[in-house]
Amino acid sequence: MNSLTSQELKDFAKNVVGVDAIGIAPIERFEGAPEYMSPRTVFPEAKSVIVFARRIIRGCYRGIERGTHWPSYQVFAYSGLTKLVHQANYRIGRFIEDHGYLSVPCPPAATLKEAGPRGPVSPGGKYPRDVNVSLRIAAVLAGLGEMGWSKVLLTPQFGPRQRLGLILTDAELEPDPIRINRICDRCKLCVRDCPGNAIDLKKGNTFTAAGVSWECNDLKLGKCKLTHFGLNRTTSPHFVKTFPGIYLPMDEQGNTWVEGWNFGHSLFNAVPTWKAFSAYPIAICGARGCIISCMNHLEKRRRIGNIFRHDFTNEKPWRLPEKPLVGHEDHHGFVYDPENSGEVTGSVKSDWY
């Protein structure tokens, strides 16, 4: 049985599987990680952490940026590309196991702090069985890129435009150097253009691992999740059409991440577009600030490698009114008028629909 080198693994992943970037971190870089996020809690014998990226096609953001077509991002680039990442994880895992080493896939999931225990807490002071390794932190430690102010991973090739996969293995592979503070220039356009006002302008959190430190904003996870799920009127025409009288100002919401998750799932069946999308992981906001504005800025400043012939956009992001229309409450709570040919009241008349 042949041994496995880092270069052999990378050549297979890039040239055969088709991943766009791949990096390797030794398990020692994760020393001090909380047990509920540690690779060693998942696989104590792990010696290497492999993180790879598949790019998000830039054009997938065009429909949401124009306000005309959500499936190109939601179905294709978000949930669809995630499935391709899983396929790549499987093929790379087979390659590793063909060389006699174990391959442990770690798909993305909410952490214990975000979602809470999904079952009874184990006796004896053990952590609940909800260990999830942070793919973004692992990507930084594997040398793939850095975390921008928004907390989104930025790579030298694509900026914020990729989905990540992670594999733990007992193969001892040559690691890649950590590279940080090279891409994000703290322009803070992600703050300005986040429709949920979830990205803090000044307040940050410092992360330290493997002897390096970096700072990201103190993200308001609850507001992020509400907007991500389409509960923000300013960027979700689907919500406005079904709930024209509901007012949910993002700045006044104090929910947790899991409250936003549960609230969104409780409403998906009520909104036809969401009901269709909810068979997949849902992302109605389209990452307007944390990806689109960031990507556009980094391309214009030539801070990333994947550059195009034309700017993605030179327009400010569109927004719908946050408040219901003046006079909307004239329906007095009724939704049907049998004396006027069954006219349905309370609906918003707009060329969006």
Regions from the PLM with identified roles:
Residues 292, 300-330:
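C-terminal/domain-terminus segments
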Residues 61-63, 234-240, 301-307, 353:
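Short conserved micro-motifs at the rims of enzyme active sites and ligand-binding pockets
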Residues 331-335:
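Charge-rich alpha-helical segments
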Residues 1-90:
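Non-catalytic, usually N-terminal nucleic-acid engagement modules in DNA/RNA processing proteins
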Residues 339-341:
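A cross-kingdom feature that marks long, compositionally biased intrinsically disordered regions
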Residues 33, 74-75, 81-296, 311-313:
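Catalytic cores of enzyme domains
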Residues 28, 56, 173, 200, ...:
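Flexible, active-site-proximal loop/turn residues at the rims of small-molecule/cofactor binding pockets
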Residues 343-353:
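Intrinsically disordered, low-structural-confidence terminal and linker regions
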